[in-house]
Curated annotation (Swiss-Prot):
GO cellular component: membrane
Organism: Caenorhabditis elegans
Transmembrane segments: 19-39, 51-71, 87-107, 118-138
Lipid bilayer topology: Multi-pass membrane protein
Compartments where located: Membrane
Protein name, UniProt field: Uncharacterized protein C48B4.10
Pfam families in the cross-refs: DUF5373
């Protein structure tokens, strides 16, 4: 019976990392990126200011580029996206702190608190948690891609399905053949 995967050659097959051993992290990262693109497109249709339209259009193009980078697994651009997103974590963090401070002022104030007044803090906190989760998943994906070889080795399919023939590619004149000479 022919083998599709040779366990002595782990570089022939690259298994992506999984969250809790079930969900591929690449799927999670791509899903979160697509949700971001869809939300930006919806925001684009609700916005009337031309400056925001240009900024949202540029953001959509950059997010589509990022999705392609992560699908193609371009290591350098994945790292560049991760580090720039890490730097821009300051923006949602500052917004979350601002909404927390306004929530504290509201909580210790004299007025009654309603859910509508608490919801901006809750939304900011949920967004910040999802953003940090996204960055953590990107980091795991980048770490896993560092162990993946850039070029998969050549496979010799003439002597069996996906059996790696080291002797045929090491520069030697003689290769060991699995079949007899004719």
């Amino acid at each position: 019976m022919s083998k599709f995967y040779d366990p002595s050659q782990p570089e022939q097959s690259y298994d992506s990392p999984k969250l809790f051993g079930i969900i591929p992290i690449k799927f999670i990262v791509s899903f979160l990126q697509l949700v971001s693109i869809v939300s930006q497109i919806l925001w684009l249709y609700s916005e009337n200011d031309k400056i925001y339209l240009v900024l949202l259009s540029v953001g959509i193009v950059l997010n589509v580029f990022t999705v392609v980078v992560f699908i193609k697994e371009h290591k350098l651009l994945m790292r560049a996206h991760y580090y720039s997103a890490l730097i821009f974590t300051v923006v949602p963090f500052i917004y979350a702190v601002y909404t927390f401070i306004s929530f504290i002022e509201l909580f210790f104030g004299d007025k009654d608190i309603t859910f509508n007044q608490c919801s901006p803090f809750a939304y900011a906190f949920i967004f910040l948690c999802i953003y940090i989760f996204y960055l953590a998943m990107c980091r795991v994906l980048i770490k896993a891609s560092e162990f993946q070889p850039d070029d998969m080795p050549d496979l010799d399919t003439t002597q069996g399905l996906f059996h790696y023939n080291r002797d045929a590619y090491d520069g030697g004149e003689r290769a060991k053949l699995m079949y007899g000479e004719v």
